[in-house]
């Protein structure tokens, strides 16, 4: 290559094309000037665009290695507190949720206590203990019978053997002692707040405790499969010996036990006046779906006016009789039986 020189000679300049001369001057100018830092960085970026990508991958790999070395330290994620998180904290402060009460479980616990007492042969009477076990077995049989047959079949069964009904109620009373509360007390308080001389039908009354408590304030008629005392009228709950529209209030307190629930609700509607109240109290664990159960009753000619749960164990419902009946056998009127496990 020859030495670089400027084109200053006029003769030389005449023989060199103008376009080529301009390119040569620009090249000489750039070669003599020092490039700026920004220009050099731009050139580096153009020449090595893969460098940043390699650095990012290396940083990610280093973070992953650090995380594997310290697995106990979770990554710190800063997020705004949601309402669901606050609700969860509140629930934790309240403590563990109460278990739903089931009569069959309470009955099993009662029998376990009896077994513990029987474990001491020096104090327990073997004959009395054998009788107690026999009565417990008969109670389980009678309880299952009531939940798995119709009201008319149960009425005929106890009509032939009234002593079986006494044994059942004695066993039921023993189970009630283990319950944390009883909805019957709530119903009695509710009746005491009502105006005097209401016509009240207590269906499946047992020993007619409502008539005993508020019999002077209201006109109480107590019905059950067997009359255990003078206050009770024996009958089938689906065929009440009463006229149409003769009751202001009809009560089913833990007494919807047969398989023909539709007949029981229809009979309650028949004897109620328009605007009369149907009061139902049942064990919460028996409901397949509380919503569907209430909707089924409303379709049978009622309007729901009140519903609440009593200490997670019992459900209290209140309906008013209306004129229109949408369906005679609507879907959803189902209750699970309370069956006590055999031991």
UniProtKB/Swiss-Prot annotation:
Give the Enzyme Commission number.
Answer: 2.1.1.-
**Which InterPro entries does the record cross-reference, listed alphabetically?**
RRP8, RRP8_N, SAM-dependent_MTases_sf
Q: Which GO terms describe its cellular component?
A: chromatin silencing complex; nucleolus; rDNA heterochromatin
Chain positions recorded as S-adenosyl-L-methionine binding sites:
169, 204, 224, 236-237, 253
Q: Name one GO biological process term.
A: cellular response to glucose starvation
User: Does Methyltransferase count among this protein's keywords?
Assistant: yes
* SUPFAM superfamilies (UniProt xref): S-adenosyl-L-methionine-dependent methyltransferases
Region feature Disordered, mapped onto this chain: 1-123
The coiled-coil regions, if any, are: none
Q: Which UniProt keywords apply?
A: Chromatin regulator, Methyltransferase, Nucleus, Repressor, rRNA processing, S-adenosyl-L-methionine, Transcription, Transcription regulation, Transferase
Q: Where is the composition biased (Acidic residues)?
A: 112-123
Does the record carry Methyltransferase as a key word?
yes
Protein's cellular compartments: Nucleus, Nucleolus
Q: Quote the biased-composition stretches of kind Basic residues, using this chain's numbering.
A: 45-59, 89-101
Single GO MF descriptor: methylated histone binding
Highest taxon listed in the record's lineage = Eukaryota
Which residue stretches does the UniProt record annotate as biased composition, category Basic and acidic residues?
7-33
Name the PANTHER family for this protein: RIBOSOMAL RNA-PROCESSING PROTEIN 8 (PTHR12787:SF0)
Function as written in the Swiss-Prot or TrEMBL entry: Probable methyltransferase required to silence rDNA. Involved in regulation of antisense ribosomal siRNA production. Required for the N1-methyladenosine modification of 26S rRNAs.
This protein's name: Ribosomal RNA-processing protein 8
The encoding gene: rrp-8
């Amino acid at each position: 290559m020859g030495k670089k020189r400027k084109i200053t000679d006029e003769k030389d300049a005449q023989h060199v094309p103008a376009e080529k001369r301009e390119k040569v001057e620009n090249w000489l100018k750039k070669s003599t000037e020092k490039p700026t830092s920004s220009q050099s960085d731009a050139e580096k970026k153009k020449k090595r665009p893969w460098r940043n990508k390699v650095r990012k991958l290396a940083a990610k790999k280093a973070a992953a290695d650090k995380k594997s070395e310290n697995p106990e330290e979770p990554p710190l994620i800063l997020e705004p507190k949601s309402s669901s998180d606050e609700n969860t904290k509140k629930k934790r402060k309240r403590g563990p949720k109460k278990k739903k009460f089931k009569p069959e479980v309470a009955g099993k616990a009662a029998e376990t206590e009896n077994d513990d007492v029987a474990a001491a042969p020096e104090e327990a009477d073997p004959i009395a203990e054998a009788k107690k076990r026999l009565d417990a077995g008969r109670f389980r049989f009678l309880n299952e019978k009531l939940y798995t047959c119709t009201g008319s079949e149960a009425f005929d069964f106890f009509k032939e053997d009234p002593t079986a009904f006494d044994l059942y109620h004695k066993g039921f009373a023993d189970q009630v002692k283990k319950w944390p509360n009883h909805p019957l007390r709530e119903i009695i308080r509710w009746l005491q707040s009502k105006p005097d001389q209401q016509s009240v039908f207590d269906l499946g009354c047992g020993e007619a405790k409502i008539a005993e408590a508020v019999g002077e304030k209201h006109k109480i008629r107590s019905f059950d499969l067997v009359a255990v005392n003078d206050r009770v009228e024996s009958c089938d709950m689906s065929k009440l010996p009463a006229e149409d529209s003769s009751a202001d209030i009809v009560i089913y307190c833990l007494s919807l036990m047969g398989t023909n629930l539709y007949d029981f609700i229809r009979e309650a509607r028949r004897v109620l006046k328009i605007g009369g109240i149907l009061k139902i109290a049942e064990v919460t664990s028996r409901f397949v779906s509380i919503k569907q159960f209430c909707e089924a009753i409303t379709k049978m000619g009622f309007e729901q006016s009140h519903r609440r749960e009593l200490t997670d164990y019992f459900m209290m419902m209140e309906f008013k009789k209306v004129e229109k009946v949408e369906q005679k056998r609507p879907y959803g009127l189902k209750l699970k039986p309370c069956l006590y496990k055999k031991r």
